[in-house]
Amino acid sequence: MRLRIRKKVKLSYQAALLHFEQHGGTAPEQPKAPLAACPNCHGTGLIAAEHPPAADTEQYPQVAIIGGGIGGVALAVACLHRGIPFTLYERDSDFSARSQGYGLTLQQASKAIAGLGIVSLDQGVVSTRHVVHNTDGTIVGEWGMRKWLDTEATHAPKRTNVHIARQSLRLALLEQLDAHPQLHEAVKWGHQLVNLHETPAGVELSFAVAGEIKTAQADLVVGADGIRSAVRNLVLGQDANSLRYLDCIAILGICPLSALSDVESDLLDSATVFQTANGHERIYVMPFAADSVMWQLSFPMAESEAQALSAQGAQALKAEACQRTQWHAPIPQILAATPAALVSGYPVYDRALLSADALADIGPVTLLGDAAHPMSPFKGQGANQALLDALSLARIIVRGCRLKPSWRELGLRERVLEEFEAEMLERSAIKVQDSADAAEFLHSEVVLHESDEPRGRCLK
């Protein structure tokens, strides 16, 4: 909600406008009333209720969400809270069928979490210090809440970063769906999309289910099925061959702190993020949970070599990581104590940025998250952008369709998708580019620039 413009601001603007009219020059910018959080929903768009609203099939389109990762489940939750009918299709047989990655850091998406009905994340860990070292342990940069408090700096951080296991966040979102009155109809496990085509009634989807082909109908299809999106391939013809290799490999692992009981280091206090680099290899270590840390080692490597190393499996990846990181404590100890079963590695890819024109002719189908704008992991933005995409799309569906039955005549692309895609692509484009740039400068001498700020900021 907007507050009233203060009298002092009005008078200042009127004086500046009078001066402009009399003497010319640059016209003053008209002041805008400041925004304040709604007292009913506190800025989340939600109010507490015993049950979610019933799905409104008269006002809203039936949404088919392809992919049960963080972005897809977040969209399902956002639809549930707004009475938008949806079905979530996931190819895995159940929640635990395969690993859903390691840890992630909620940055600007922390507010989006509240907009998805999650008041707190019990498994989340807040970091208050970020340290950058060279390989002998010399600190070349440090920032975060504790840094500013220790130095009595006058500026405080605008937000904190919350670290959480990807599966923990995904589970917290899925638990929101438990309130659905027909959960078994709303979430379809074991459904792999094999085809879709537009019909006069909407979109017909075909799924491979336990060796059979089953069909379903929807008004709107949302591809939230990751970097190798089946939806994207079907509507744009862009498969894995159109991925863009970023000339490096990432090896990840999770180490329980109990395996480091004989290691004394303030870097292992579950509230510190640290990274160490030499201008070629770079390791990043962050809290994974209260009792474990996650590490990510990355370095340049030819694509064929990276694919071969990844294919060799966890033991080979761990051995490669240990061999490359005989640096300051506790890095060698962390990697040595990491169970091989908790190590994985992959070549790092993204895709060229999509344009709105590329999506203009695909009808009532859209993409979000990695399906729309995959990016390198080096800025920690993938999950954040997927959450923002999901909340944005649900809100625009409400705005474009509620009390406006004309969406059936005008079409969802004009009524909803053009606005959503323009906002999503503009917001995520800078993140994709920054993440690609980071894949380069984090493996160069730039990462060792002495300054108390995130790496790469000195380039801007």
Task: Describe the role of every protein-language-model region.
Residues 139, 159, 171-340:
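Conserved FAD-binding catalytic core of PHBH/FMO-like flavoproteins
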